[in-house]
Amino acid sequence: MLSKRIIPCLDVKDGVVVKGVQFRNHEVMGGIVELARRYAEEGADELVFYDITASSDARVVDKSWVSRVAEVIDIPFCVAGGIKSVEDARQILEFGADKVSINSPALADPGLITRLAERFGVQCVVVGIDSYFDADTGHYQVKQFTGDESRTRTTAWHTLDWVQEAQKRGAGEIVLNVMNQDGMRQGYDLEQLKLVRAVCKVPLIASGGAGAMEHFRDAFTLADVDGALAASVFHKGLIPIPELKRWLKNEGVAIRE
């Protein structure tokens, strides 16, 4: 059995790590390189960096900090933010990232997923999906440009349809960012994760809502996700990664210590 992954998420804005609640009201959490080093030392399996305003600002992630992160950590890391071309991705991978993640640019140009997969291999291509449950319609909708509240828009895609389309085009991994739960610390959206898991044949990463060790366990055991991504509980020291991993192992979850 493959080990489940614990993945701190670092949202980057204006050169520092920030965290919001439901993608709004961001507060500064610390320096990019300092937090990356800390999480690697604490035993994180992987890191994900989102330059959250790159797509809405029509620019590419700042590559200067990518190379600095690569110099100080020895675990895989993924970078996202305004990657719109093979060349954008090539530069980020050359600066030391192990994977690139695309979200809004893939919605604008789904063929980008295929071009990246053909050039770098599916193992390097992650598709992030910002999913919002619309209580009025009862549908899970995909949102775009979520890094800037004023520019966020609802796309025509239902989440399950976009998950399947992204895989068909070459996504090697899906990160499901559940907007309703983001920063609330009330648990992952297990119902939605189970629905996505049923149609997702590539590794699936849960994101949005972790607030207790039980939430990680439930995502792994009840929704069968491959990795669990979290931010505020790690940034604020509410759940130490070494303790989390020991606890999960005692709960029978296959985890790297």
Swiss-Prot record:
Q: Which GO terms describe its cellular component?
A: cytoplasm
| One of the Pfam families matching this protein, by short name | His_biosynth
CDD domains, per the entry: HisF (cd04731)
Subcellular localization is given as: Cytoplasm
User: Which EC number(s) are documented for this chain?
Assistant: 4.3.2.10
Query: Where is this protein chiefly located?
Result: cytoplasm
Q: Identify the metabolic or biological route this protein is part of.
A: Amino-acid biosynthesis; L-histidine biosynthesis; L-histidine from 5-phospho-alpha-D-ribose 1-diphosphate: step 5/9
Q: Which residues form a coiled coil?
A: none
User: Can you tell me which residues form the catalytic site?
Assistant: 11, 130
Which GO MF term does the entry hold, naming one?
imidazoleglycerol-phosphate synthase activity
- Keywords from the named record: Amino-acid biosynthesis, Cytoplasm, Histidine biosynthesis, Lyase
Q: Does the keyword Amino-acid biosynthesis apply?
A: yes
| The reaction(s) this protein catalyses | 5-[(5-phospho-1-deoxy-D-ribulos-1-ylimino)methylamino]-1-(5-phospho-beta-D-ribosyl)imidazole-4-carboxamide + L-glutamine = D-erythro-1-(imidazol-4-yl)glycerol 3-phosphate + 5-amino-1-(5-phospho-beta-D-ribosyl)imidazole-4-carboxamide + L-glutamate + H(+)
Q: What are the recorded Gene Ontology BP terms?
A: L-histidine biosynthetic process
Q: Which family does it belong to?
A: Belongs to the HisA/HisF family.
Q: How does it assemble?
A: Heterodimer of HisH and HisF.
Q: What does this protein do?
A: IGPS catalyzes the conversion of PRFAR and glutamine to IGP, AICAR and glutamate. The HisF subunit catalyzes the cyclization activity that produces IGP and AICAR from PRFAR using the ammonia provided by the HisH subunit.
Q: What is this protein called?
A: Imidazole glycerol phosphate synthase subunit HisF
